[in-house]
Amino acid sequence: MTLVPHVIANERTYPMPKRCAIAICLDGCEPEYLDVAIAEGLMPNLKMMRETGTDRIAHSVIPSFTNPNKLSIATGRPPAVHGICGNYLFDPDTGEEVMMNDVRFLRAPTVFSRFYEAGARVAMVTAKDKLRALLSAGLKFDEGRAIAFSAERADETSVAN
């Protein structure tokens, strides 16, 4: 399959990488913690990645919860656009909190799904299983071009050829 030169996702244009691209998102910590750990020699791999790759600090979206922030990164848009406004929502019909980890709440495609639709191979790994379905929305796992799993449930994961 011939890959296109760029992908458009949610009104933003992303160039198709010429070689394998990996994005690592470290969430929930002050960037200075990482700087200190690197300076003290505690994170040599992160130090190497910063020196040889690209390192960016993103500003948090409000509310400052994992799900809205991860989906803002994955879609390139704020919660008002992608629809994941918190980790939970209150369902007035049932009177219960509902975890916002279901694709039905997602109102914008992820950048990953747009690259997949353009013919790229996509692998998505997340620490928390609650994010796996949202981050892998739009990927098809029966075509041999997409893999998604969580570290939390890695013991239940297998890939068959």
Residue ranges with predicted function:
Residues D35-G76, R121-A123:
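Short, structured active-site-proximal loop/turn typified by the sulfatase FGly-forming signature C/S-X-P-X-R
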Residues T13-P15, K47, P63, F112-E117:
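A general structural signal for short secondary-structure junctions and capping/turn motifs
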Residues E30, N45, F65, R107, ...:
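Short phosphate-engaging motifs
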Residues D27, I73, F115:
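A residue-level signal for conserved active-site and pocket-lining positions in enzyme catalytic cores
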Residues L3-T54:
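Active-site-proximal N-terminal segment of extracellular/periplasmic enzymes that hydrolyze or transfer
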Residues R77-N161:
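His/Asp/Glu-rich, glycine-adjacent segments
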Residues G28-E32, E51-I57, F65-N69, N87-M100:
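Glycine-/proline-rich flexible loop or hinge segments
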